[in-house]
Structures are given as structure tokens and as C-alpha cells.
Amino acid sequence: MQEKRVHPRVQVDLAVSCEPKGGAAFAGVAKDVSMGGMFIESTEVVPFGTQVTIAVRISGVDLKLPGTVRWAKPGGLGVQFGLLGARETHSISQLLTR
């Protein structure tokens, strides 16, 4: 099967808070991240297409990342980032080049 990802991913272990639009925030753990999105390990079920805001601390900087759920399965969800600002882009870029 051919890899569809555009951006390289790095393995991480970052505590996150994920808040679905119109729903309650829940805790999860980001297990991999790229410039395009992240996989969040969680027991919560969030439907495909749900807009979310991910609160995470990267390199000592608190970030709120907008995104959309692109897939969900028992144990986690894949989130594609929305429009990121310069600060968010820089922080993720720094994480990817460690």
C-alpha cells in the first residue's frame, strides 16, 4: 500500500487536551506529529469531520492548534491541522527537527 502522507512524521509522547466544537474537552496523548497533523491516543470517540482545538505545550510554548478529525478508531484519532499561525508553525517545525 502506498503512503499517502505529504509531511514526514516524528514519534512523540505529548499530553494534549482536545476540545471538539460544541463538546467537552478531553485528555489524550499525541503519539506522532507532522506539519500537517497528529495522531492522538484517546479512549474518546470523535466523529469524522469534527472540528477540534488541540491544546499542547511544545518546546515550552503553550499552543492551541485548530484541526479537523480525518479518521477515528478505537484508541485514537487522526487530526489534520487547520490554518496555523507563525508561532504554531515555528514550534512544530522545531519539534520535527530535534
Where are these regions (language model features)?
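N-terminal helix initiation/capping motif
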Residues: 1-33, 43, 88-98
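Short beta-alpha junctions and helix-cap segments that line functional grooves
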Residues: 2-3, 52-53, 65-67
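Short conserved beta-strand and strand-loop elements enriched in small hydrophobics
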Residues: 14-19, 49-62
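Short, conserved beta-turn/loop elements at beta-strand boundaries and strand-helix junctions
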Residues: 21, 35, 72-77
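Conserved hydrophobic positions within beta-strands
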Residues: 30, 67-69
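Short, solvent-exposed secondary-structure boundary/capping segments
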Residues: 39-42, 75-83
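Beta-strand residues that line the small-molecule/cofactor-binding core
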Residues: 62-64, 71
